[in-house]
Amino acid sequence: MHRFRKNTCLISDYFHSTGGNYNLSQPCVNIGMVGHVDHGKTTLVRALSGVWTDTHSEEVKRGISIRLGYADSPFMKCPKCPEPQCYTVEKTCPNCGEKTEEHRTVSFVDAPGHETLMATMLSGAAIMDGAVLVIAANEDCPQPQTKEHLMALDIIGIKNIVIVQNKIDLVSREKIIENYHQIKEFVKGTVAENAPVIPISAQQNINIDILIDALETQIPTPSHKVDKPASMLIARSFDINKPGASIEEIRGGVIGGTLTEGVLHPGDELEIRPGIKVTTEGSTRWIPILTTVSSIYAGATKVDEATPGGLLAVGTYLDPTLTKGDSLTGQMAGVPGTLPETRHQFVMELHLLDRVVGVTREEKINEIKTSEPLMLNIGTATTVGVVTSARKNEAQVALKRPISAAIGAMVAISRRVDSRWRLIGVGVIKS
């Protein structure tokens, strides 16, 4: 079998680092950008990182995020200026001209805000350590996906939240204050009730220093289990080869995501589960993939060791046809023999919401019924499960596409409401 070449810095075209000429340390925290469509999430990521994460051709054409976007950025600190003016993403302080020092590097996960892309948002939320809820000051609050995204953060258990009141340059002071009170009323009684509300303009770079100060306070670097076997949630996968490349030039497939525990090095063996679907004589099964790490990138920086926190691009010796077009998204990678089992069905304990959010009429949520199809998000995986048995607080589902998940894993549950998948609750895998 042909052993594909090691990957080069072409990997960094897919997991971006800041537009400045920095030598970044590995990101230590993943921060999600969530909120309603066109409220400025991608523009804010660009203001903080210099990277425009909408690079897919359809995203450029339609002007909205479709896939998860990623960008790394350093939070720099001026040794002379007081807080919050000391914070910037520049190498020199915009206030006094002093050379700044790197405080920490973060990864941003830019989730789409369109209602039809809720599954993508939920898979991104699985790798977030905290989140920025972006709310436009020039529209009434809350908008439908503002409500749905906040409910998703609450259900998944993301408690470290900063609220950004964006586009303050487009409205009057009176409208900003009115919108602020709408925001505070909206988050009352939710996981974001005590989150700070930072008024900014991502387009004009207004109050970015105050926002970074809030992110430093509200979303600390989490502690990670580096003494465990390496385990990685795959959020993207790529074929980085250009059309027409000769066999000698072909490079192995790339997986992108975040380490949840353990340490990863070039040369380490990896198992990927559930793996690839194989059909023989009318019988279908999923076979785990085994490969070796050829290179690791944190943004554009090649590293010899990767630890949990932040986003990584991992080069492998896999046939790139296995990784092209996000085909391994939702799978798990880790030390062979240590990953959770592949599940074609499971029983989950149910915790349903009272009402459907994100729709015009917030209807009461009825109990889950046998034979009902549900969209299920487990980690970065999205699959459809058909309910094979249902009781008041428990349901068994048969999956259209298997997942690798442990007992106790959390499941975000959505059902079809008015031809759209709507979040209705959360489950916990029991068996």
Curated annotation (Swiss-Prot):
Signal peptide: none
GO molecular function: GTP binding; GTPase activity; metal ion binding; translation elongation factor activity; translation initiation factor activity; tRNA binding
PROSITE patterns found in the cross-reference section: G_TR_2 (PS51722)
Protein's UniProt keywords contain GTP-binding: yes
Keyword flag Cytoplasm: no
Protein name: Translation initiation factor 2 subunit gamma
Pfam family, one: eIF2_C
Residues engaged in binding Mg(2+) 1: T42, S65
InterPro entries: eIF2G, eIF2g_C, eIF2g_dom_2, eIF2g_GTP-bd, P-loop_NTPase, Small_GTP-bd, T_Tr_GTP-bd_dom, TIF2_gsu
Cellular component, GO annotation: cytosol
Cofactor names: Mg(2+)
Keywords in alphabetical order: GTP-binding, Hydrolase, Initiation factor, Magnesium, Metal-binding, Nucleotide-binding, Protein biosynthesis, Zinc
Gene3D superfamilies: P-loop containing nucleotide triphosphate hydrolases, Translation factors
GO terms for biological process, alphabetical: formation of translation preinitiation complex
Record organism: Methanosarcina mazei (strain ATCC BAA-159 / DSM 3647 / Goe1 / Go1 / JCM 11833 / OCM 88) (Methanosarcina frisia)
